[in-house]
Amino acid sequence: QYRRLSHISDAAFFRLMMQHLPVDRALYLDSDMVITQSLHDLFSLDMRGYPVAAVQDSFLARTEWNHPTGLHTTPYFNSGMLLVDLAQWREHNIAAQLLQTATTIDKSVPYGDQCFLNTVFQKNWLQLEESWNFQTGAVEYFQKRNLSEVFPKPDTVPPVIHYTTRAKPWLCDYGEIPFIEVYWQYYCADWPEA
């Protein structure tokens, strides 16, 4: 029922109910990501009392934009990778807060559930370095406009590559996508039977 960007699926909203999982900590990862190294250091990170740890949205942090709830004045995270303190979510009934936000926010939520999460956790989230959710869409956007200095592609492969926007490696109608070769390396790898 919400208007959002076409590449954001209904399934993205499922993470709003994470507090019902029978664990105290969870690491949520979008399905359009490639993990290139162990996430042990990320998962065992000291969250310093925050209910969620995430990476700032790389595109929105570097552009002028208007968020339907007025969050353009505060750091806004990308919800593709979330380290979540579920015990704290249950204690504060975050699911109810998210659902309440969903009923009161404007029906135009360009970034789907990410808008609700940023509204509820405004100024109450731990900001992680960009390599934990390296968002390829930002690099592609700025490179096309000869502004690669705004958000350069790193020299090393980040631990988490997030193929944000509609430009996905498996969709052949898009041009140069940062770290597309990493996606194809994993796609073409021989995977042992489980």
Regions of interest found by a model, annotated:
Residues G70-M81:
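A recurrent flexible, glycine/aromatic-enriched loop bordering the glycosyltransferase active site
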Residues A26:
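Short aromatic/hydrophobic "clamp" motif used to bind/position activated sugar donors
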Residues Q1-H20:
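Active-site-proximal specificity loops/subdomain of glycosyltransferases
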Residues Y2-R3, A61-N66, G137-A138:
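Short, charged, surface-exposed secondary-structure boundary motifs
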Residues M33-H67:
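Conserved donor-nucleotide/metal-binding helix-loop-beta segment in metal-dependent transferases, i.e.
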Residues L29:
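Catalytic metal- and UDP-sugar-binding loop of GT-A-like glycosyltransferases, i.e.
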Residues V84-A194:
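A glycosyltransferase accessory/donor-loop signature
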Residues R4-H7, N66-H72, N146-V150:
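Short, P/G- and charge-enriched loop/turn segments at secondary-structure junctions
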